[in-house]
Amino acid sequence: MGFRVLVLVVMATTSALPFTFSEEPGRSPFRPALRSEEAQALRHGLTLLLARRADGQPPDMRQPEMRRPEMRRPEVRQPEFAELSVGQRRWDVDQCMYYCLTGVVGYSYTECETMCT
């Protein structure tokens, strides 16, 4: 786990810190081209990442508006079985299974059977 964090930090710093070439004598030929706000934001993000890793939380650093929406299971509301005839109950379960299995979410047969019955 520690190695993955180290690799993540190295990748983040090397990809987020573009360098410009400087030919001035007496100076390093590479100098960071980041503005201070960008560098501060990067340091803050890495600090949060390391703190979350230390706490055992998942490293989701994206802003809330940039996060992918959570996939929710569709709520399958079943009418009371006492209200329906036997044929109507069978059709509702079959229809529920059909829509569950052919839906975008990709539930297994067992998951659909649990939700629909």
Swiss-Prot record:
Coarse class of the protein's main subcellular location: secreted
Annotated region described as Disordered, given as residue ranges: 53-79
Domain of life: Eukaryota
GO CC entries: extracellular region
Keywords: Cleavage on pair of basic residues, Disulfide bond, Ion channel impairing toxin, Neurotoxin, Potassium channel impairing toxin, Secreted, Signal, Toxin
Transmembrane segments: none
Disulfide bonds listed in the record: C96-C116, C100-C112
Basic and acidic residues composition bias: residue spans: 62-79
UniProt note on tissues of expression: Expressed by the venom duct.
Stretch forming the signal peptide: 1-22
Positions of the propeptide removed during maturation: 23-90
Subcellular location: Secreted
Gene Ontology terms for molecular function: potassium channel regulator activity; toxin activity
Domain notes: The cysteine framework is XIV (C-C-C-C).
Family: Belongs to the conotoxin R superfamily.
Name of this protein: Conotoxin vil14.3
